[in-house]
Amino acid sequence: MSPCGRARRQTSRGAMAVLAWKFPRTRLPMGASALCVVVLCWLYIFPVYRLPNEKEIVQGVLQQGTAWRRNQTAARAFRKQMEDCCDPAHLFAMTKMNSPMGKSMWYDGEFLYSFTIDNSTYSLFPQATPFQLPLKKCAVVGNGGILKKSGCGRQIDEANFVMRCNLPPLSSEYTKDVGSKSQLVTANPSIIRQRFQNLLWSRKTFVDNMKIYNHSYIYMPAFSMKTGTEPSLRVYYTLSDVGANQTVLFANPNFLRSIGKFWKSRGIHAKRLSTGLFLVSAALGLCEEVAIYGFWPFSVNMHEQPISHHYYDNVLPFSGFHAMPEEFLQLWYLHKIGALRMQLDPCEDTSLQPTS
């Protein structure tokens, strides 16, 4: 038995001893006995773990420093893990090869709903994953406020393949910090509902907004939740009808589910992983080199100065939906072992930039 197993058994026995000591001659009701068993089993399976708070994490990063050296062995080992668990090369997107006509699939974010691939959806899929694999040098760009005044735009645009999250603004006021290049951009159905009224009245506005992404793939989780399917299909038809440069790819729910299980087995307990972690996971399986930017979910920067939540606004997410500190710690670990590079310091000297 492992030391962890022995410790858990000792914890359970200790709890039983406390109950016996406090109630030496008291017989617990049947319901209370069952509840005690459930609690003790829970403690055995999920021992108590306290996640470091924001200040502790920031201090830990400062103490360890951001110095980095690429570890080809670690990168290959993690890529192999991604291939074994999730097969991003074949399952990253819905294709005619992995989603044939008549196949039944489950929504990855709902347990009660499934769907069947019919002619109306099958015709929207590419024959296979449309990338020349492996991708060489990838940049995954989050939207964290740490990017503001970072001067990382040029470095980001030097990557061969740039992935971005949730249709971020790329206007000229931001390009010095976040770049302008993109090959793949995610778009959650919730964004289509909130910003573009489900494309019921604002198709032109949507098409105009998409032009900044040039020839990017628009990656959408159309089959994660049943409510997301219709908005995602509208995006596909809208861009197709106007002959837009962008191409819609639908995330394969089996891939998303596998990624979720992979990270849950490594200690991330959340209702759902963030879009950023999904993208980084895919990049680690598809790319030879991965650098990530804007993945800093804290309210202060590396100099412990206050920063906005996003580089373009300070709108906070709903609490409890994602486990951002846990995700950060996992990515920070991959940075420290050299499997990916996490950019936290400014890329260029921005001290002479005028303040806004």
From Swiss-Prot:
EC number: 2.4.3.8
Transmembrane recorded as keyword: yes
Positions of glycan attachment: N71, N119, N214, N245
Spans traversing the lipid bilayer: 30-48
Result when mutating S190A: Enzyme activity is 33% of the wild-type. A 2-fold increase in Km value for ganglioside GM3 and 1.25 fold increase in Km value for CMP-N-acetyl-beta-neuraminate
InterPro entries, per database record: Glyco_trans_29, Glycosyltr_29_Sialyltrsf, GT29-like_sf, Sialyl_trans
Catalysed reaction, written as an equation: an N-acetyl-alpha-neuraminyl-(2->3)-beta-D-galactosyl derivative + CMP-N-acetyl-beta-neuraminate = an N-acetyl-alpha-neuraminyl-(2->8)-N-acetyl-alpha-neuraminyl-(2->3)-beta-D-galactosyl derivative + CMP + H(+); a ganglioside GM3 (d18:1(4E)) + CMP-N-acetyl-beta-neuraminate = a ganglioside GD3 (d18:1(4E)) + CMP + H(+); a ganglioside GD3 (d18:1(4E)) + CMP-N-acetyl-beta-neuraminate = a ganglioside GT3 (d18:1(4E)) + CMP + H(+); a ganglioside GD1a (d18:1(4E)) + CMP-N-acetyl-beta-neuraminate = a ganglioside GT1a (d18:1(4E)) + CMP + H(+)
Tissues where this protein is expressed: Strongly expressed in melanoma cell lines, adult and fetal brain and to a lesser extent in adult and fetal lung.
Molecular function terms from GO: alpha-N-acetylneuraminate alpha-2,8-sialyltransferase activity; sialyltransferase activity
Annotated effect of mutating R272K: Enzyme activity is 98% of the wild-type
Effect of P189A: Enzyme activity is 91% of the wild-type
Membrane topology: Single-pass type II membrane protein
Pathway entry: Protein modification; protein glycosylation; Lipid metabolism; sphingolipid metabolism
Catalytic residues in the record: H322
Keywords: Disulfide bond, Glycoprotein, Glycosyltransferase, Golgi apparatus, Lipid metabolism, Membrane, Signal-anchor, Sphingolipid metabolism, Transferase, Transmembrane, Transmembrane helix
Residues exposed to the Lumenal side: 49-356
UniProt xrefs under Gene3D superfamilies: Glycosyl transferase family 29 (3.90.1480.20)
Function: Catalyzes the addition of sialic acid in alpha 2,8-linkage to the sialic acid moiety of the ganglioside GM3 to form ganglioside GD3; gangliosides are a subfamily of complex glycosphingolipds that contain one or more residues of sialic acid. Can catalyze the addition of a second alpha-2,8-sialic acid to GD3 to form GT3. Can use GM1b, GD1a and GT1b as acceptor substrates to synthesize GD1c, GT1a and GQ1b respectively. Can synthesize unusual tetra- and pentasialylated lactosylceramide derivatives identified as GQ3 (II3Neu5Ac4-Gg2Cer) and GP3 (II3Neu5Ac5-Gg2Cer) in breast cancer cells.
Name the UniProt record assigns to this protein: Alpha-N-acetylneuraminide alpha-2,8-sialyltransferase
Gene name of the record: ST8SIA1
